[in-house]
Amino acid sequence: MQIILLDKVANLGSLGDQVNVKSGYARNYLIPQGKAVSATKKNIEFFEARRAELEAKLAETLAAAEARAAKITALGSVTISSKAGDEGKLFGSIGTRDIADAVTAAGVEICKSEVRLPNGVLRTTGDHEVHFQVHSDVFAELNVIIVAE
């Protein structure tokens, strides 16, 4: 099925690309999410008329994401306290939700799906580097300090 992308889609293309995808992927995911329209003559003409508007909207979201990434980086570090044993091993773990809540409490709005933990959940006290993906092209890093209660 031929579609026109209205947004950047990972492993598929960016705004304005005409791509061929399986019809189920287009009908059940891309079109309902507003990320694509089917490539009919009418839709192609309509898209070309609105292309500048859509590109401006995409640039605006990218600028907002870069501003959020700068705020995250400006925080420097976030401290989370958790119950731990004598050797610094936590009772339980610190996951994406805990980190997102701590960063949000520090003043930057983050949802848990934007937190990237490459080595899995945090299970020890100390300093840990955490990555955030606030946009498909924008990343940020933050130092999370876990202290024992």
Curated annotation (Swiss-Prot):
Keywords assigned by UniProt, alphabetized: Ribonucleoprotein, Ribosomal protein, RNA-binding, rRNA-binding
Highest taxon in the source lineage: Bacteria
GO BP: any one term: translation
Cited SUPFAM superfamilies: L9 N-domain-like, Ribosomal protein L9 C-domain
Matches recorded under Pfam families: Ribosomal_L9_C (PF03948), Ribosomal_L9_N (PF01281)
Any one of the GO CC terms: ribosome
MF terms (GO), sorted A to Z: rRNA binding; structural constituent of ribosome
InterPro entries: Ribosomal_bL9 (IPR000244), Ribosomal_bL9/RNase_H1_N (IPR009027), Ribosomal_bL9_bac/chp (IPR020594), Ribosomal_bL9_C (IPR020069), Ribosomal_bL9_C_sf (IPR036791), Ribosomal_bL9_N (IPR020070), Ribosomal_bL9_N_sf (IPR036935)
PROSITE patterns cross-referenced by the UniProt entry: RIBOSOMAL_L9 (PS00651)
Family (UniProt): Belongs to the bacterial ribosomal protein bL9 family.
Function, as annotated: Binds to the 23S rRNA.
Protein name: Large ribosomal subunit protein bL9
Organism of derivation: Proteus mirabilis (strain HI4320)
Gene: rplI
